[in-house]
């Protein structure tokens, strides 16, 4: 397990089981304290700035309660055809999103904020993902698994959707939900490790 300097704790400001799993696999000791902040994309807001803003808002919200600990806030968005695709509102929305991804390359951006005593680092990681053509029947079958309903862009690259991923440029773990190598570098730079 990683040991942290300064005797401080590490908090993940997210309820995402995928983010928790990635941190655990990286042998980081942390606790989960989900942040509850509005996730509203304003018209004209750059997608990367949007991801950074949400990550910062989440980290700050939790850091305000635990000022002596380090907090990781993150937000992942999918951008296809200049449209930000967040978590689908319902099955019809999920189908719409998957049709946008089908046969195209899109970007997945995660904003990450590390907040702690006298430290705030905010960065983004962007990965390009290419998806094969997906038939309407395949889309319906995929949606009925329930897998896309709690994920940005209506898919999980680590699950059934992987059968349609034909290429990836960048950090795979970013697409899962947390660019763990970037988080590690941020923690080193902040003196946490």
UniProtKB/Swiss-Prot annotation:
Nucleoside triphosphate pyrophosphatase that hydrolyzes dTTP and UTP. May have a dual role in cell division arrest and in preventing the incorporation of modified nucleotides into cellular nucleic acids. The active site is at residue 75. Its cofactor is a divalent metal cation. It comes from the Bacteria. GO terms for cellular component: cytoplasm. Belongs to the Maf family. YhdE subfamily. One of its GO terms (biological process) is nucleotide metabolic process. This is dTTP/UTP pyrophosphatase. Pfam families: Maf. InterPro entries: ITPase-like_fam, Maf-like. It catalyses: dTTP + H2O = dTMP + diphosphate + H(+); UTP + H2O = UMP + diphosphate + H(+). It is found in: Cytoplasm. HAMAP family: Maf. One of its GO terms (molecular function) is dTTP diphosphatase activity. Keywords: Cytoplasm, Hydrolase, Nucleotide metabolism. Its EC number is 3.6.1.9. The record marks 18, 76, 158 as: Important for substrate specificity.
């Amino acid at each position: 397990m990683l040991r942290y300097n300064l005797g401080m704790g590490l908090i993940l400001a997210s309820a995402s089981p995928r983010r928790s799993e990635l941190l655990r696999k990286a042998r980081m000791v942390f606790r989960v304290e989900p942040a509850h902040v509005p996730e509203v994309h304003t018209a004209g807001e750059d997608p990367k700035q949007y991801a950074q803003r949400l990550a910062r808002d989440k980290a700050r919200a939790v850091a305000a309660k635990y000022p002596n600990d380090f907090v990781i806030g993150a937000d992942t968005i999918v951008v296809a055809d200049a449209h930000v695709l967040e978590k689908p509102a319902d099955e019809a929305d999920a189908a719409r999103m998957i049709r946008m991804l089908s046969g195209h390359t899109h970007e997945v951006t995660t904003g990450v904020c590390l907040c702690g005593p006298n430290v705030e680092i905010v960065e983004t990681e962007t990965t390009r993902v290419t998806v094969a053509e997906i038939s309407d029947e395949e889309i319906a079958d995929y949606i009925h698994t329930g897998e896309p309903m709690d994920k940005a862009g209506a898919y999980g690259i680590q699950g059934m959707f992987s059968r349609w991923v034909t290429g990836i440029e960048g950090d795979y773990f970013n697409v899962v939900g947390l660019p763990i190598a970037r988080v590690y570098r941020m923690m080193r730079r902040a003196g946490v490790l």
